[in-house]
């Protein structure tokens, strides 16, 4: 059997720190970010299905979200101000991401390509799946800002404002529900969110 470096590369997601140009109270890596995005994307899809007549496969969306930044094991996490400095850089970075996604898929054993390619290659996702994962990605970045700000780190003040605009652009009924039901707790302390717990 031929050796594959696929999972050895994926395991390096935990070594890639997000928000590299900003001072962080707590550093966040791509691996933990991907898990949070997967949980939030799954919730958004489930909310859409349960409350707003959606027909999404919430489990598939959780998987897509788990892999949404996987290509960063080859490209690193380019800071947002650099990535979107102008339209040409944004376009070139998208092309680099596409190459990295394909290179990552090519590392998987041939007999598993058809399993991993549709998870890693965003072109294989439906528009609705892409939208949900993008909403979850922006929501998780916003939640990171709330956590940093609540810890007294004003470095994330402008990032929060920018992300509020992004969330407004990606707004949906399921996102409004998530924001109303789940996000307020992120402004509270551990004691405050544990008050009603019988433990």
UniProtKB/Swiss-Prot annotation:
What job does the chain carry out? Answer: Catalyzes the strictly specific dephosphorylation of 2'-deoxyribonucleoside 5'-monophosphates.
Q: Does the keyword Lyase apply?
A: no
GO MF terms listed in the record are: 5'-deoxynucleotidase activity; metal ion binding; nucleotide binding
Q: Which InterPro entries match?
A: HD/PDEase_dom (IPR003607), HD_domain (IPR006674), YfbR (IPR022971), YfbR/HDDC2 (IPR039356)
Q: Domain named HD: which ranges?
A: 30-142
List the GO terms this entry assigns under cellular component, sorted alphabetically.
cytoplasm
Q: Which organism is it from?
A: Salmonella typhi
Binding-site list for substrate:
18-19, 33, 69, 77-80, 137
Q: Write out the entry's keywords from A to Z.
A: Cytoplasm, Hydrolase, Metal-binding, Nucleotide-binding
Q: Tell me, how does this one assemble?
A: Homodimer.
Enzyme Commission (EC) number = 3.1.3.89
Q: What is the lineage of its organism?
A: Bacteria, Pseudomonadati, Pseudomonadota, Gammaproteobacteria, Enterobacterales
State the compartments where it is located.
Cytoplasm
Binding of a divalent metal cation occurs at: 33, 68-69, 137
**Which PANTHER family does its entry note?**
5'-DEOXYNUCLEOTIDASE HDDC2
Q: What is this protein called?
A: 5'-deoxynucleotidase YfbR
Record-linked SMART domains: HDc
Q: Keyword check for Metal-binding, yes or no.
A: yes
Entry-linked Pfam families: YfbR-like (PF12917)
Catalytic activity entry:
a 2'-deoxyribonucleoside 5'-phosphate + H2O = a 2'-deoxyribonucleoside + phosphate
Site positions (Appears to be important in orienting the phosphate for catalysis) are 18
């Amino acid at each position: 059997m031929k050796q594959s470096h696929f999972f050895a590369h994926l395991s390096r997601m935990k070594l890639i720190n997000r928000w590299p140009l900003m001072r962080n109270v707590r550093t966040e890596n791509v691996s933990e970010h991907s898990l949070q995005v997967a949980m939030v994307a799954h919730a958004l899809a489930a909310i859409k299905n349960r409350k707003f007549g959606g027909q999404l496969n919430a489990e598939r969306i959780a998987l897509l979200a788990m892999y949404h930044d996987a290509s960063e094991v080859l490209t690193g996490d380019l800071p947002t101000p650099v990535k979107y400095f102008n339209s040409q850089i944004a376009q070139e970075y998208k092309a680099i991401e596409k190459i990295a996604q394909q290179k990552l898929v090519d590392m998987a054993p041939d007999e598993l390509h058809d399993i991993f390619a549709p998870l890693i290659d965003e072109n294989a996702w439906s528009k609705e799946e892409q939208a949900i994962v993008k909403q979850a990605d922006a929501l998780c970045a916003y939640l990171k800002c709330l956590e940093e700000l609540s810890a007294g780190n004003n470095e994330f003040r402008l990032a929060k404002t920018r992300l509020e605009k992004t969330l407004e652009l990606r707004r949906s009924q399921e996102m409004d529900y998530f924001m109303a039901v789940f996000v307020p707790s992120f402004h509270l302390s551990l004691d405050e969110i544990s008050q009603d717990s019988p433990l």
